[in-house]
Amino acid sequence: MAEQSAGGQGAPEGRDSRDSREGRGRRDGGRGGRDSDKSNYLERVVAINRVSKVVKGGRRFSFTALVIVGDGNGMVGVGYGKAKEVPAAIAKGVEEARKGFFRVPLIGGTITHPVQGEAAAGVVLLRPASPGTGVIAGGAARAVLECAGVHDILAKSLGSDNAINVVHATVAALKMLQRPEEVAARRGLPIEDVAPAGMLKARRESEALAAAAVREAQTSGAQP
């Protein structure tokens, strides 16, 4: 009888411990799902370097990370992080990039006019391209353009091949871009005399698509 009572008490304990483990697993899974949906930004790590500092006791090593962050729709930023571990350096770079967000004027997936940017020894030339061309650019410049949401462009590096210089030269070029309305207002001319007809047509089409998407979202949200 003693053995039976001992066995009867052991079964509930086993079930309770198993249920507690399953519940703990469900809680962890739910928390991980929330963390995975934290950010919708595009992030590109362009370069990671190991640097050292000579001190009295020897050398201290750390890592630097050059990171590009953008929303893929005209907003982009560049960050440079430094830490003792690679993940921490990337995280610092992402945080700095988000603090330095700026808007890139785009029409139909390309830039508004040719522009050349310079930073230190880096020189980057950007030219608009017709739809379907794609992003014709090197690795460092491509990361900036893709995160900014540029789909068609011709880019060429005319100076240093250093990734940091190329990235900052590309950013300098993008910050020099102007909208056709700004140029027309400064010159006192109608916008048709400043921007090509094809560019204005592409802008009207993109605005129509954006307005249709907004109306569709409002309609779907209003339905019960």
Swiss-Prot record:
Origin: domain of life: Bacteria
Residues annotated as signal peptide: none
GO CC, alphabetical: small ribosomal subunit
Entry-linked Gene3D superfamilies: 3.30.160.20, 3.30.230.10
The keyword rRNA-binding is annotated on this UniProt entry: yes
PROSITE patterns for the chain: RIBOSOMAL_S5 (PS00585), S5_DSRBD (PS50881)
Single biological process term from Gene Ontology: translation
Domain S5 DRBM: 41-104
Region described as Disordered: 1-38
Keyword match RNA-binding: yes
Sequence ranges of Basic and acidic residues compositional bias: 13-38
Pfam family, one: Ribosomal_S5
GO molecular function, one term: rRNA binding
InterPro entries: Ribosomal_Su5_D2-typ_SF, Ribosomal_uS5, Ribosomal_uS5_bac-type, Ribosomal_uS5_C, Ribosomal_uS5_N, Ribosomal_uS5_N_CS, Ribsml_uS5_D2-typ_fold_subgr
Keyword terms: Ribonucleoprotein, Ribosomal protein, RNA-binding, rRNA-binding
Annotated domain remarks: The N-terminal domain interacts with the head of the 30S subunit; the C-terminal domain interacts with the body and contacts protein S4. The interaction surface between S4 and S5 is involved in control of translational fidelity.
Binding partners and assembly: Part of the 30S ribosomal subunit. Contacts proteins S4 and S8.
Listed NCBIfam families: rpsE_bact
Similarity field: Belongs to the universal ribosomal protein uS5 family.
Function: With S4 and S12 plays an important role in translational accuracy. Located at the back of the 30S subunit body where it stabilizes the conformation of the head with respect to the body.
Name recorded for this polypeptide: Small ribosomal subunit protein uS5
Organism lineage string: Bacteria, Bacillati, Actinomycetota, Actinomycetes, Mycobacteriales
